[in-house]
Regions:
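N-terminal acidic, glycine/proline-rich low-complexity segments
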Residues: 1-300
């Protein structure tokens, strides 16, 4: 008997980097293949084109997913965040006009989780943790998360680089990152910067140019269409294993006031982080599923 699809709630900052588009595409491809079920997506920046870009990718797969966005219109909403989201929204169909009211991420999360069985949801975060911190701090959503979510997997941190530095997703909202790592009582896995910074993917999108992810990569990366696979690796590691990557032993993760993340092995801990063992193998594995996703988007 096949395993039940993993119930996934995704939070993304789609806009400041293009790998979010590929990560969402491979997640939707995994849903199509039966290993995942996407129950909702929230956007954690203030860009008015974020939901349009997300919805355009979902529609490229022929699906509609409950969506919501960060209500703080000043958070990461400058020109960099619009670099590809605006062109994507102007090229592909979606249901979120930029000047129309957009659903609040908090309500989207509450609605999605309230329909799920206890301990059944994996929450994936591929951006700053402002939305998740808000969810956990809310008197309704916080207890609901602790009840319904089994595990959080986030692209965050830096553990093995030399020298260690404050990773971007953490740096953009250090208090939020500390809130999530401290308030969340369940298992939390981090896919840090060094785990996928040398794993380059996206070239396969040149073979299937007529889809939102391909346009995003072409605008962001130029004709080489190669980018580190931080968000792709986070999604795939949340769903299972990736060739060339592995999880650390159990332990604890602390984030200091400057946003530096530190891991301490502890058999009683419920935190892990991803390690890269073979960059070429990881790139092949991620590129293979991205190619299938691109083919699906192009044929819809």
């Amino acid at each position: 008997m096949n395993a039940k699809p993993m119930r996934i709630f995704l939070d993304t900052d789609i806009g400041p980097d293009c790998d979010d588009t590929a990560a969402l595409a491979i997640l939707l491809q995994r849903c199509r293949e039966g290993s995942a079920a996407l129950i909702g997506v929230t956007h954690c920046t203030g860009s008015r084109y974020g939901l349009a870009c997300i919805d355009s990718i979902c529609r490229a797969f022929g699906v509609r997913v409950p969506l919501g966005t960060c209500p703080d219109r000043d958070f990461l909403s400058d020109g960099v965040a619009l670099r590809y989201t605006k062109p994507v929204s102007e090229t592909f169909p979606h249901g979120f006009p930029p000047d129309a009211p957009q659903p609040d991420a908090l309500g989207t999360c509450i609605d999605a989780l309230s329909k799920e069985e206890d301990g059944s949801v994996t929450m994936i975060a591929i951006g700053p943790l402002n939305n998740l911190a808000r969810f956990l701090s809310d008197p309704v959503c916080g207890p609901l998360m602790q009840k319904k979510v089994r595990r959080i997997v986030t692209m965050a941190g830096c553990f093995d680089a030399d020298p260690v530095f404050t990773e971007w997703n953490v740096e953009m909202d250090i208090p939020a990152a500390r809130t999530v790592f401290e308030k969340w009582t369940g298992p939390l896995d981090a896919c840090p910067w060094e785990a996928a910074g040398s794993v380059l993917t996206g070239a396969c999108l040149k073979e299937y140019p007529d889809n939102p992810a391909a346009l995003a990569y072409r605008i962001y990366c130029g004709e080489k269409m190669l980018r580190p696979s931080w968000d792709l690796a986070t999604v795939e590691m949340a769903l299972g294993e990736v060739s060339g990557m592995e999880w650390s032993e159990d332990g604890r993760i602390e984030i200091d006031a400057k946003g530096v993340t530190r891991f301490s092995p502890d058999k009683a801990g419920n935190r892990r982080y991803a390690r890269l063992t073979d960059a070429e193998a990881a790139a092949r594995a991620l590129e293979n599923v991205l190619r299938r996703a691109a083919e699906t988007m192009t044929r819809q």
